[in-house]
Amino acid sequence: MGQEPRTLPPSPNWYCARCSDAVPGGLFGFAARTSVFLVRVGPGAGESPGTPPFRVIGELVGHTERVSGFTFSHHPGQYNLCATSSDDGTVKIWDVETKTVVTEHALHQHTISTLHWSPRVKDLIVSGDEKGVVFCYWFNRNDSQHLFIEPRTIFCLTCSPHHEDLVAIGYKDGIVVIIDISKKGEVIHRLRGHDDEIHSIAWCPLPGEDCLSINQEETSEEAEITNGNAVAQAPVTKGCYLATGSKDQTIRIWSCSRGRGVMILKLPFLKRRGGGIDPTVKERLWLTLHWPSNQPTQLVSSCFGGELLQWDLTQSWRRKYTLFSASSEGQNHSRIVFNLCPLQTEDDKQLLLSTSMDRDVKCWDIATLECSWTLPSLGGFAYSLAFSSVDIGSLAIGVGDGMIRVWNTLSIKNNYDVKNFWQGVKSKVTALCWHPTKEGCLAFGTDDGKVGLYDTYSNKPPQISSTYHKKTVYTLAWGPPVPPMSLGGEGDRPSLALYSCGGEGIVLQHNPWKLSGEAFDINKLIRDTNSIKYKLPVHTEISWKADGKIMALGNEDGSIEIFQIPNLKLICTIQQHHKLVNTISWHHEHGSQPELSYLMASGSNNAVIYVHNLKTVIESSPESPVTITEPYRTLSGHTAKITSVAWSPHHDGRLVSASYDGTAQVWDALREEPLCNFRGHRGRLLCVAWSPLDPDCIYSGADDFCVHKWLTSMQDHSRPPQGKKSIELEKKRLSQPKAKPKKKKKPTLRTPVKLESIDGNEEESMKENSGPVENGVSDQEGEEQAREPELPCGLAPAVSREPVICTPVSSGFEKSKVTINNKVILLKKEPPKEKPETLIKKRKARSLLPLSTSLDHRSKEELHQDCLVLATAKHSRELNEDVSADVEERFHLGLFTDRATLYRMIDIEGKGHLENGHPELFHQLMLWKGDLKGVLQTAAERGELTDNLVAMAPAAGYHVWLWAVEAFAKQLCFQDQYVKAASHLLSIHKVYEAVELLKSNHFYREAIAIAKARLRPEDPVLKDLYLSWGTVLERDGHYAVAAKCYLGATCAYDAAKVLAKKGDAASLRTAAELAAIVGEDELSASLALRCAQELLLANNWVGAQEALQLHESLQGQRLVFCLLELLSRHLEEKQLSEGKSSSSYHTWNTGTEGPFVERVTAVWKSIFSLDTPEQYQEAFQKLQNIKYPSATNNTPAKQLLLHICHDLTLAVLSQQMASWDEAVQALLRAVVRSYDSGSFTIMQEVYSAFLPDGCDHLRDKLGDHQSPATPAFKSLEAFFLYGRLYEFWWSLSRPCPNSSVWVRAGHRTLSVEPSQQLDTASTEETDPETSQPEPNRPSELDLRLTEEGERMLSTFKELFSEKHASLQNSQRTVAEVQETLAEMIRQHQKSQLCKSTANGPDKNEPEVEAEQPLCSSQSQCKEEKNEPLSLPELTKRLTEANQRMAKFPESIKAWPFPDVLECCLVLLLIRSHFPGCLAQEMQQQAQELLQKYGNTKTYRRHCQTFCM
């Protein structure tokens, strides 16, 4: 694949009449989501011959909702202008060259459905909305015209290419009208014939109706197509043909001169190879048209399944059509086509571009009707990226539209060679992982918990694991099988198992040979192997080291656990992150240094990336787990959560990270330096992957539906953009809602809150739940809710154009609101009458027998008749049919006749109560009958059980009462009265059911109260309640209450861990104390140390010591913190610290006199009772096992001082034990640490405090014998002299400044690049005057320099170590060769890029200009190096340097040594100022060293200056 950025853009929007367009010259644009993407097509677009000539060149960003229409200006000279319409209610005019908005309007009050730029008027844009309103907008004069033609939904409109005032409009119901905008939208023709949506309108490219020989004698159906009856028709001069495409499966050709249809083309059903016709195909039909300007007798249309047809209009009686790409299988779209637009390239080639539901943009050659190229696109978030280690260049992309893409990034013929895999997926693809050794085997995970395997080289559906995760699959990883899968024989089990981590916190091990079998939860193995009794943390990430021996698990609490095969023994826990771990990545194993493979990078919901070096832990394999609280490297710069990290396979220690801040950052992890920052995405980055072949190429995916291929060498920024930290934003979000619950209690605020939730989040969630469907809803994924805080403040009013007015619930004394024309008017209500409560109480109760009562209030005649009927019924011996009918008709007489009639009256009265909504009265009547069981059954069926009915249920029997209580409990659950339902279940002794009911509905507090009161203390249900509630509280951030739950469940370890999640000093101290109380000593010690480190950052020395005092094993750390406090006070008194602060120091009586070491030991003796050699030895052993990473220039000052004081503490302890070898090594580690960090001042203070009289004292203690510390002592003495050398030099050049900032900056400059300080040496040496002392320097100083200077200069001879000079020269040679190789690769890539971008027309001159700097830079590089830049020569130099380095003894290589050549240059520079001060022997030795070992780029120029 060429060296040029690439983009997989979002899918073009669906179901829009005009969402893509193109202009002559090769510029094509299409609307995707809220943006418009621009594609350059034709010669010059491809970067090299033979590649598809198209390239995504930009994006128009400005709309806040879906873009519903897009059109270019087709007027010469205006091809750079285009117009867009959006669901946000605006129409914008853009300049595509600057990608900015020229002007816009928001005239529409309803959703805009389509727009078109008039081909006849340069500044006219016509748009229509779903309510039938048309706006004509002339942007040059900022004028507009409002037209309301029909009260129907507009689907499409097209301006006439022949008459500037004519516009054809298609409606949803099939009506087509032609209007004249110059006559206020007068309807010229109303064309009837279609009976469904009009999808497309195309004017004939030629005026008049003589271009087509259409038979005027049409079918009877054609004869019925006439003009509207009530509209006066105005014939159009010369007339013109118009084509319309409709959902009714027909294309109609209309005559504008006669206002009637002249031709009908019915879409054919085209059978696909190997399949039948889908019966629902009509429901998915979209019929779009294109009438070619150079072929007016041809018409192009879409068809049912994505095929394109070219109709021959000259043979209308035969309905002849030609199928696009008829000879090639698989070239057509696989689903319906939405838009067609023509494009004429710079070489006059006629192309046709189509967008489809299959998410492909295809380009067709009109001459051959064959597909020229395809641009794939994405219909969802790009969740995951994975390169295959077997099929190099195959990039798998997991997308939220339910499809997996496999991009062959090495394809020569097609730069966008992408295959889609969708069978069996049916959900968002959130995780991907290629098999390390099996070709084409791709594992995938989805957001519904599915795990499967795809064979990308076959058409078979994927294998799906029978074990699903309960939530989203976060990560997939291939690793060696562990028990029980690994217990089988060699041929009975796979060599690699598939591990999946789900959102519920479980890691499953799947057997790829038998996915139908049950997957194993590795938590069980972890518990058994490590004898863990506490609750395991929720896992969020899994990563295997490349050698398959170590597994890392990231957890929700921010911890990372390191396990060792075969039984997953826990060897290490990293307590660094404080939030959920999102990503873990191990360094590759083919680096130049083997120890780099032990580097592990991790990112979490915090914005900081930590790199840990686990070499010591893995190689030692400790018996008990080690806790790591200090990172090897810290990479700070992102401002939001880290979602993905990936190591470069081409470099040592180079890392790329993706973040929610919208950028991808490349780091030099070893030096903690940001290198370059990519800002091409428009959303939050979700994944990133380094190209396996190109060291300059990185791929990244985001929630903007894009995957970008970008080059590190082309980025303008080096670090992420500045912004508010995510921690600050989180604090604001947590602090704002605290007052809201109080407001919600007011009844007047309930209605607005509910409306807001329905309009916002619930609508998004409904879209999300709709899943991957075919109507384009999946383009708006639910995760976009999280982006709301990132949008501009002015966005919210634009989204909701009409304010929602919520009427509050008002009381009798409140004023009611009346809305008139969006204005709120307050109307006063009349004051209520006095004593309303008294009136309510006097209200008469509702009658139980209202029907019979009303019948007793009829007329006198009817009442008399009742009496006669009643008498006849009571006293007649035999009732005839007439009397029975009269009694039955007069049911109210049941009160006076027999029981059967009374029952009938009660039934009728009861039905009346039910119909009127008074079930309680019906129940009373049924109780009067004595049918209590029937009442209960009826009330239960209707959900109308009450407390009274349930209370009376025992009268119907014990079993009836049990049944009634259960039915009432179910009814209460439907009414969300769970607590009351649980109380009723308790009344029938169903305690477990009541507890489960409350637990399942998150009433944990009530459930625990019931369980604690009614169940046995050892009942497992109670513990499960505590753990479930604790998990919920922990997830919501209520750590203290969660800790109580874990304590209640006797999970004290988990209680301490959850308390520590907050990360502040108070929480850590409480957690440490809790762990100490419950006997978790190791956890208590680690938490106490973390607490002390937090207090150290706040300069709270007293609190830090109190925290360390919690655990006896931290005695050594107390000594370190004590020494650190004394040293910090010492530096502050000297004003050497970075700034004075109100530090809470201890009131230790140390005094200011005496050596610093004696003061330290005095405090240790008085405060910590440290006096005997045994105590010193014990403290030394505790501290010796703690290893800190080496320092860099970016190491924070507090952390640097802590690490230095740790080494100094070991040195002091060694001195007290008379172990001088250990003392020397510890002192040297402290000095080297300050040297590596560039803190020259700290290094000098270490010497002044611990070696005030130099190294002679240590030399005497070591003696003359050769000990293991002898090389270390020589290095320590050399660094001491190195510092004295610079102090001596600065004292000569000017009075020594007091500012430590200047001193430190000067040292850093020299230690990195001595040439920057020595550039003036050549000029100073050639001029004799400059060699003399400064004129204003006093003569006494000259005498002092002469007497004392020579004696001091003679001591600097110890710095002239030829062994170290040779070693350092070899190291510089290796570094320079590696840098030169990297530069060669970069230059080659740039040259290729220059050539590719200069292939277009009129770019020959820029190509030459682009090549000239490259050639000049290369020649300049050759001049500086005086050697050819050939690969064999570089390889030879690298081999020789490595061989020389291998010959040096380990004692020389083990301990750092000051740069020998740098010291030589400083001494020679001093000589240039003071010629007589340096002995001839030293001068000659320095020059010889420079001549012999100064052949590298760093020192070559200065060697020529001083050695001539």
UniProtKB/Swiss-Prot annotation:
Changing R359A: Abolishes interaction with U4 snRNA. Changing L1367P: In NEDCAM; uncertain significance. Changing F381D: Abolishes interaction with U4 snRNA. This is Gem-associated protein 5. Residues 739-748 have a biased composition (Basic residues). Changing H1364P: In NEDCAM; uncertain significance. Changing D704E: In NEDCAM; uncertain significance. The modification Phosphothreonine is found at T51, T751. Changing L1068P: In NEDCAM; impaired function in spliceosomal snRNP assembly; decreased protein abundance; decreased protein stability; decreased interaction with DDX20; decreased interaction with GEMIN4. Belongs to the WD repeat gemin-5 family. The SMN complex catalyzes the assembly of small nuclear ribonucleoproteins (snRNPs), the building blocks of the spliceosome, and thereby plays an important role in the splicing of cellular pre-mRNAs. Most spliceosomal snRNPs contain a common set of Sm proteins SNRPB, SNRPD1, SNRPD2, SNRPD3, SNRPE, SNRPF and SNRPG that assemble in a heptameric protein ring on the Sm site of the small nuclear RNA to form the core snRNP (Sm core).
